Amino acid sequence: AEVVFPASATLACNEIFGGIDWKKKRTVYVSPFEHNATMRSLFLYQKRYGFLITELALDEKGMELDQEKIRFQFMREKPDLVVMSHVSNVTGYILPVEEIAASAKEYEAIVVVDGAQALGLVPISLKNSPIDFYVFAGHKTLYGPFGIGGFIYHSKYRLKHMIAGGTGSDSLNLEMPEEGTVGYEPGSPNIV
């Protein structure tokens, strides 16, 4: 796994969603607990590429995800991308992201988890995880400053580069570097 540091979790979501090759991706599942930073980013790409967004099924009380119903959803309509918050910023509900990601991987879906409300607070290990991209914000449960965010890139799926520019390495090459994460972090970041 590698870590990419854009300036916020919102930019991280845009870099991930924008880096997906949408030509072969038609079905996206989201939890009903998503932050608007995630949903607005996803909606932008839905308008561009016309894929379907479906909410993951809730239990009878409407308060938690129903993993059995979700498995049936995936059987009926194969997931290409699954997007989930790790923790709801409204209710505090901790979603079963590992379990749902494992179900999604049975269909080779890309799994993105918004961990902005969780990283630093809820234990997570991506070492053997089915999660491809884990997004975080420095100013929330990591208690850092505004203007830092990122994502843990734990995937074989190669994202297209969304932004081009200086990287401080391989300067004679006009293509963005493909190795590591430097190609996803062009320009000079804020430093304190």
PLM-predicted stretches and their roles:
Residues 1-192:
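Pyridoxal 5′-phosphate
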